[in-house]
Amino acid sequence: MTVATASRMDFVRAGRAQPVHLDIGRDHPFLHRAFAAVCFGVMLAGAVMLPAFTVAGVQMRAILPVGLLTLFGILYTNEAWAALHGQRLLLALLGGLAILGAFVSYMYGTPANDILFAVVSIHVQAAVVLLAAAVVARISGLRAAVIATLAVIGVSAVVATLQMLDVSAAWSLRTTFAHMQHQALDELEFFGNRRPMGLSFSPIQLATQLTLAFAIFAAAREKERRATTGVTKTSDPAVILALLVFFAACLATATRSPILGGFIFLAVYAALRRAWWIAMTIIFGSLLAYLAWPLLMETIQSTSPRLTRTDDNSAAARLVFAYYGLRLFLDNPLGYGLVFQPYDLWTKYWTDLYMMRAAHGAQENDLHNYVLSMLNFYGIGILLFVPVLMRLLRNAGAYVIFFIPYFIHIVFHNSGPLDNDTIIWFVIGALSANVVARRKPARRRRFAPREPSQYGGPALAGAGASANRLRLMSPRYGSLQARGGFRAP
């Protein structure tokens, strides 16, 4: 072992006894970090609240990421290159799917202009948003990006809660946002039945955003804990509290799939962390819910009646969509391309569908199933990218568990990566920002020379070795990258 390696080991041993504090985004001046945090929040707010707002025919949610990526790429070139390098595997996946989608669309007979527009609006936009979020988050720091995300989505959730309580001002505010985006109110079923959606484009979009808000908060908490205390198997009470808030917000949207995903996450989390107190909380909570069930149901059914029903057309139509989507895939395994609309093909299958309850859903809606939608968009060729996807999930490691509510939710809706969901790229980009664990400088003291047998090499010269150790303990070497950090895909 070399002298430098032995000296570095001495430094690590000495630093273990020192207090640890988080230093997130501290490499940049405060004003730079504050400006980046504001930019991240504005960019996210445009995607959440005004996704269809256009300027000169171009959507604002596309203008902001392009502009901010260009600005921060010029001002912080090194950070931009680092973000590009960190996201290279995910960017390669987006590029591969763009090529596959374009090829499938061409083979299906889609016009070239439509193919180009679809590739730009789906894959290129996803790549730009991902890089913009990653670069800005590297400047602002992970914590600031998380706070901005929770603030933007939290505002929409609060407005949705007021809408659930039938506060007219909350509905008027949403109507104003709809007019700004030229959203036809008479064409939205959600406005007809006054289903709460906050300031998001739809209740489904808000539910998707809530799952991602929970995911980024819980993953960031886990990331910080690992950076300060190392890999831990203990549960985090803050995550459980966040889950309860998440459940309450989902009640406002009257969307069932995120709640189902939340309970599945809770079971998996309790099992992996061996947290008996979570199990006891579930038991006592279930007992309390049983005793308060009549009052609880009366309250919920008066505000969100669909939440407690499993026999409505929305639930029954899921079987229709699953059967219809599977039939479409089996009849054309090569796929239908990026502009595929399943409700354009229902007549061929109507003889098999019309006897099913809520069969008319196939005439009017998309498949409401993320997996089947992807298979029909890209065809069986998408299976070639499964190894890349598995590697990305493996790189994410223990943080994948916090996305369980998101995964469960998109299975039942027209939402997900590359399918009506831009916010996922903000979350992935933000979580790729480094969490740096800095150790306070140890006492400046001279180390006694080690014996040769301790390092398997020549004895260290006393004065030279001590000087080398003190050099390693200088501020230049005062930062250790936590092993448990979120590895960028």
PLM feature spans:
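Helix-loop-helix junctions and helix-breaking kinks within/between transmembrane helices
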Residues: 51-64, 112-121, 201-208, 234-270, ...
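Long extracytoplasmic/lumenal interhelical loops at the membrane interface
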Residues: 298-378
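Alpha-helical transmembrane segments of multi-pass inner-membrane proteins
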Residues: 146-179, 184-253, 259-271
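Transmembrane alpha-helices of multi-pass inner-membrane enzymes
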Residues: 69-72, 277, 397-410, 414-464, ...
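A membrane-periplasm/extracellular boundary helix in multi-pass inner-membrane enzymes
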Residues: 103, 158-168, 253, 270-309, ...
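Interfacial loop-to-transmembrane-helix boundary motif in multi-pass membrane proteins
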Residues: 33-39, 87-97, 131-176
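N-terminal hydrophobic segments of proteins, predominantly signal-anchor/transmembrane helices
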Residues: 33-53, 66-128, 155, 390, ...
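Hydrophobic transmembrane alpha-helices and their immediate junctions
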Residues: 371-408, 439-443
